[in-house]
Curated annotation (Swiss-Prot):
GO terms for biological process: aerobic respiration. The chain crosses the membrane at residues 25-45, 91-111, 126-146, 170-190, 205-225, 252-272, 290-310, 330-350. One of its GO terms (molecular function) is oxidoreductase activity, acting on NAD(P)H, quinone or similar compound as acceptor. GO terms for cellular component: plasma membrane. It comes from Burkholderia lata (strain ATCC 17760 / DSM 23089 / LMG 22485 / NCIMB 9086 / R18194 / 383). NDH-1 shuttles electrons from NADH, via FMN and iron-sulfur (Fe-S) centers, to quinones in the respiratory chain. The immediate electron acceptor for the enzyme in this species is believed to be ubiquinone. Couples the redox reaction to proton translocation (for every two electrons transferred, four hydrogen ions are translocated across the cytoplasmic membrane), and thus conserves the redox energy in a proton gradient. This subunit may bind ubiquinone. This is NADH-quinone oxidoreductase subunit H. PANTHER family: NADH DEHYDROGENASE SUBUNIT 1, NADH-UBIQUINONE OXIDOREDUCTASE CHAIN 1. NDH-1 is composed of 14 different subunits. Subunits NuoA, H, J, K, L, M, N constitute the membrane sector of the complex. It is a multi-pass membrane protein. Its EC number is 7.1.1.-. It is an enzyme of class 7 (translocase). NCBIfam families: PRK06076.1-2, PRK06076.1-3.
Amino acid sequence: MSLFDTINAGGSQLLGFAWPTVWAIVRILVVSVVILLCVAYLILWERKLIGWMHVRLGPNRVGPGGLLQPIADVLKLLLKEVIQPSAASRWLYLIAPVMTVVPAFAVWAVIPFQAEAVLANVNAGLLYAMAISSIGVYAVILAGWASNSKYAFLGAMRAAAQMVSYEISMGFALVLVLMTAGSLNLSEIVGSQQHGFFAGHGVNFLSWNWLPLLPAFVVYFISGIAETNRHPFDVVEGESEIVAGHMIDYSGMAFALFFLAEYINMIVISALTATLFLGGWDAPFEFLSFIPGIFWLVLKIFALLSVFIWVRATFPRFRYDQIMRLGWKVFLPVTVVWVVVVGFWMMSPLNIWVK
């Protein structure tokens, strides 16, 4: 019996019919607190890693090695005044930051941390994740329009065009995963990557989806960078053109909520990429399977987040027309062609996805 089963059985005896509700709330709170801590120290890791790439130290004054820097940053933002522009639409202006954070948290309901460790093991988990993650663009548009600023509105329009452009390519990449796994359940998608010729010989990582679906893997991850408006796709808040885009008129915690959503979405994209293409909680080699699955999932997420940061520190920002061209003229044709290729592949005698 697993730890979760033991807690569940004990709680049922103690609280009776109220236990399922209490247990759900406890799990949601635990996941939410862990995500907030991860965001705080992801920001520190980003500043440290970029500092090392620039041959400098990064934050190193607050606490030992700068470990308390995230706490200082949070306190600073909490103490700052939220200044609302006089021409802004009050309620829409205040709703937009909250609306951008809620979907970022909601996606975690269906992401499995290891076998049977998921908040809601729904059969349409992949569809749910895609739908919920698409809601964030409405918050960006709302923020840009409610601020009643031309810079904010330009940023919002850029965000709408960019997210729509790359969501289509991401959708086709997910169709490929659905075709090969035969399920929309994220736990079953991870399970579908745990068999095959290489997995049978103990080399699990060569059986994961990243290898047969390599173009889709690359397109999905790069599109994820664009979806989160990260560098080099950050024309939404291009400092040299439109200052901070849709966030230009926000301050204090309202401003912080946009950044919180951005970093949570980075972790979400990394978690989904690890789940769909990198075997989720599966160990890379069979002889390492004794290590808990959540360790491997966290390690994969950390590696993908480091790639996010490496890309930011390395590449210059694309022009707006270059971003649109990449989405419509490169990624979309590549994913459509690969859907056809995999379709024929699955119908041929060389089908490697036979259950």
